[in-house]
């Protein structure tokens, strides 16, 4: 899991939690990483921001060790990336060309006693359930087609 910081065209920041099963973030080159964009809340805050301002900040936190790692760089995304076939549930692949990678002081990280991936995390052989909030009357009509209830 990690936190992804983006900013819109006017520089207004946004931060999102990104999660998946172990290995959903891939190191794809000496200074490049990639991760899938899964079905979300339909607001496209991260991807919308990346489309107009590719600068991103990523904070990885290992609550068990504890350790933190920061990655700052420029992101792009594609729906025809070869990694799509390797990451079940991916709607797009986001690639980040790292400009800075550095550890961050872990002294205030609280400890977590083991964790399992969310039941909503896409993976091979598992169909995530539809989140209850996507069935609420006040959001159904504004969700993208793939996100709407059946």
How should these model regions be labeled?
Residues 1-150:
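Binding-site signature for planar aromatic cofactors or substrates
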């Amino acid at each position: 899991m990690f936190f992804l910081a983006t900013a819109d065209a006017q520089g207004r920041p946004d931060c999102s939690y990104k999660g998946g099963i172990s290995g959903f973030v891939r190191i794809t080159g000496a200074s490049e990483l990639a991760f899938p964009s899964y079905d979300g809340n339909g607001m496209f805050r991260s991807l919308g921001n990346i489309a107009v301002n590719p600068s991103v900040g990523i904070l990885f936190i290992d609550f068990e060790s504890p350790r933190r790692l920061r990655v700052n760089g420029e992101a792009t995304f594609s729906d025809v990336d070869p990694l799509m076939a390797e990451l079940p549930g991916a709607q797009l692949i986001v690639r980040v060309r790292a400009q800075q990678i550095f550890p961050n002081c872990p002294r205030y990280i609280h400890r977590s006693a083991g964790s399992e991936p969310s039941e909503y995390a896409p993976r091979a052989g598992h169909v995530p359930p539809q989140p209850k909030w996507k069935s609420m009357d006040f959001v159904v009509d504004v969700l993208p087609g793939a996100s709407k209830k059946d």
